[in-house]
């Protein structure tokens, strides 16, 4: 009997909990309807209000469904454990549970409330979706209007009226309409989303190509290239590799003969053993440069894979790229004039400063070695003598044409620091 009483108590508690939750749903719906008709209702924030109400309603709906599930499970156990009472007694648990008018009324009430609230939520969501669609269309037209204006610069246009006056008037209008808190909240959410999305996209753009090329290289490319090379018996030596290999072989041969002379073992060595030793040196040298040739081909293929991966990311996530560009511009323009001038001066000195030719020479030599070539001094000298000059001209044109229009104070600070 204790088990029967415990199960019956669970049935009553579950049904009571579901019934109380349904009454809360009914009350919340009525309160929201009264709030919409009151003077405190703000049409600009009804979306946030409905989102909160929708969240609370879903929470109570989940409580009802979970309580009804416990109710049904407990009823099944009760019916399973009392077959004799079900068939012979009108006072049995079966009769009390399934033929009780109060229980039937509560279940009908709960079902009606659930159906009504789901219909109401569906209508509100459809209306909410239509409003969002209209807002997106308005925003799209607004952005198209901005993009069509070629003379627009960064975030603020340059007109006859100074920008400080327009900003002051806009803030004054915002204060009068009482929307300062709402605008600040939206700006904060937008800035937070912009920063997080930009940082995520930046890490994704840097790490994903590196991970893809590394996995492709380690898992399949190295093994396939070695098998193909050994099977085809290719001896791929370009002109630069031949020069390097020949020079290294001459150095190794000189060291070998010097070692024989200093140790006074030349008389004890036969001509055949000396030739065999030199042959082994040549074979080891060929194996070394064969591996370098394989490594060069692997690096070329992985470079193409990395470039292809970056291109795919840029094509797929164009919106994220736009957000990243906007965030970087906003970050740069939010700095003080001194910091802006400092970063511009730092970048220009690194790329086109007095000591920059040495850095360009090192960079060009690394590129030559990466592709398996001997650094060509003529090409390196030509690049170092022309590219920084072209880059310096482009930077000066950018400062004169673009930066001088946006913020003349940055240009003045830059020239003062440069002098």
Swiss-Prot record:
Cell location: Plastid, Chloroplast inner membrane
GO BP annotation list: potassium ion transport
Catalytic activity as recorded in UniProt: K(+)(in) + H(+)(out) = K(+)(out) + H(+)(in)
Single GO term (MF): proton transmembrane transporter activity
GO cellular component: a single term: chloroplast inner membrane
Keyword list, A-Z: Antiport, Chloroplast, Hydrogen ion transport, Ion transport, Membrane, Plastid, Plastid inner membrane, Potassium, Potassium transport, Transmembrane, Transmembrane helix, Transport
Main location (coarse class): plastid
UniProt topology in membrane: Multi-pass membrane protein
Matches recorded under Pfam families: CemA (PF03040)
InterPro entries per UniProt: CemA
TM spans (from-to): 196-216, 297-317, 344-364, 371-391
Family: Belongs to the CemA family.
Job description of the protein: Contributes to K(+)/H(+) antiport activity by supporting proton efflux to control proton extrusion and homeostasis in chloroplasts in a light-dependent manner to modulate photosynthesis. Prevents excessive induction of non-photochemical quenching (NPQ) under continuous-light conditions. Indirectly promotes efficient inorganic carbon uptake into chloroplasts.
Protein name per Swiss-Prot or TrEMBL: Potassium/proton antiporter CemA
Gene that this polypeptide is encoded by: cemA
């Amino acid at each position: 009997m204790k088990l029967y009483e415990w199960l019956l108590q669970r049935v009553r508690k579950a049904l009571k909990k579901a019934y109380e939750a349904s009454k809360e749903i009914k009350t919340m719906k009525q309160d929201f309807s009264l709030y919409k008709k009151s003077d405190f209702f703000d049409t600009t924030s009804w979306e946030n209000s409905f989102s909160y109400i929708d969240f609370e309603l879903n929470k109570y709906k989940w409580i009802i469904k979970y309580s009804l599930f416990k109710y049904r499970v407990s009823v099944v156990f009760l019916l399973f454990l009392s077959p004799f009472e079900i068939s012979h007694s009108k006072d049995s648990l079966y009769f009390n549970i399934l033929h009780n008018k109060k229980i039937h009324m509560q279940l009908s009430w709960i079902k009606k409330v659930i159906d009504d609230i789901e219909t109401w939520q569906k209508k509100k969501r459809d209306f909410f979706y239509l409003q969002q669609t209209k807002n997106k269309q308005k925003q799209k037209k607004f952005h198209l209007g901005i993009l069509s204006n070629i003379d627009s610069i960064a975030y603020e246009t340059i007109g006859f009226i100074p920008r400080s006056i327009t900003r002051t008037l806009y803030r004054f209008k915002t204060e009068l309409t009482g929307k300062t808190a709402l605008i600040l909240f939206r700006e904060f959410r937008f800035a937070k989303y912009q920063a997080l999305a930009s940082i995520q996209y930046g890490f994704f753009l840097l790490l994903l190509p590196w991970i893809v090329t590394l996995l492709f290289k380690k898992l399949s490319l190295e093994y396939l290239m070695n098998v193909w090379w050994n099977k085809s018996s290719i001896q791929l030596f370009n002109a630069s590799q031949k020069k390097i290999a020949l020079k290294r072989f001459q150095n190794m041969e000189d060291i070998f003969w010097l070692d024989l002379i200093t140790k006074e073992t030349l008389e004890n060595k036969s001509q055949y053993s000396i030739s065999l030793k030199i042959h082994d040196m040549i074979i080891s040298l060929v194996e070394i440069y064969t591996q370098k040739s394989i490594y060069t081909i692997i690096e070329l293929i992985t470079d193409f894979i990395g470039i292809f991966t970056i291109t795919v990311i840029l094509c797929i996530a164009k919106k994220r790229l736009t957000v990243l560009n906007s965030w970087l511009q906003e970050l740069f323009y939010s700095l003080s004039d001194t910091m802006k001038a400092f970063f511009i001066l730092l970048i220009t000195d690194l790329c086109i400063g007095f000591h920059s030719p040495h850095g360009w020479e090192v960079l060009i030599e690394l590129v030559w070695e990466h592709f398996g070539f001997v650094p060509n001094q003529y090409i390196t000298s030509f690049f170092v003598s022309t590219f920084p000059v072209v880059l310096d001209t482009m930077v000066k044109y950018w400062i004169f044409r673009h930066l001088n229009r946006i913020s003349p104070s940055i240009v003045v600070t830059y020239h003062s620091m440069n002098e």
